[in-house]
A protein has these predicted regions:
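Short glycine-rich substrate-engagement loop in P-loop NTPases that contacts/grips substrate
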Residues: 21-24, 75-112
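Pre-Walker A (pre-P-loop) alpha-helix and adjacent loop at the N terminus of AAA/AAA+ ATPase modules
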Residues: 2-50, 98-106
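Conserved catalytic/switch belt of AAA+ P-loop NTPases
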Residues: 33, 98-106, 116-154
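Conserved RecA-like P-loop NTPase ATPase core
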Residues: 16, 27, 47, 56-59, ...
Length: 155
């Protein structure tokens, strides 16, 4: 029998059901700025799990939540959503990211926010290129995947 209840997309991070308490705590630490990002060569958050678990919904909430935790202000410049298509190449990804990072951010933190949805659809070369972009201190990257085993180990 089908559930006739309407689907309600989460509106806040508190609406997300996490797979384990450690994941929730990690996200809460990042959002509250207890764990700073970017810091010490870390500028990315990887969200993974099976289809329909809310990875993309959470990814869309995180940039504003992180900005509020850092500056108590909402985003002035919206995050960049990069929906990866099968075979998306390294030069395509890097050209887009570099073009955005070359501009000044008008967010109070000075950071750019990127959501790279279905990052496992990138070619291996594109994933390797992305690793170099993740070394920036001028951006926060939120990556989502259903297939963590298909990602370059450096991501």
């Amino acid at each position: 029998m089908f559930n006739k209840e309407p689907f309600h997309e989460p509106q806040t991070i508190n609406d997300i059901i996490f797979g384990n308490p450690e994941s929730r705590l990690r996200i809460e630490d990042i959002v509250s700025n207890t764990e700073t990002i970017p810091s010490c060569g870390k500028s990315a958050i990887l969200l993974y799990g099976v289809f329909g678990t809310g990875k993309t919904s959470l990814a869309k909430m995180l940039p504003n939540a992180i900005e509020q935790g850092k500056t108590s202000e909402d985003l002035s410049l919206p995050e960049e959503m990069i929906a990866c298509q099968q075979g998306f190449s390294g030069p395509q990804v890097m050209t887009l990211i570099e073009a955005i990072l070359s501009r000044s951010s008008i967010n109070a933190s000075g950071l750019h926010y990127f959501i790279i949805d279905e990052v496992d659809n990138l070619t291996k070369l594109a994933q390797q290129s992305l690793k170099s972009a993740l070394n920036t201190t001028r951006g926060v990257f939120i990556l989502t995947t259903n297939n963590v085993s298909q990602l370059d180990k450096g991501l």
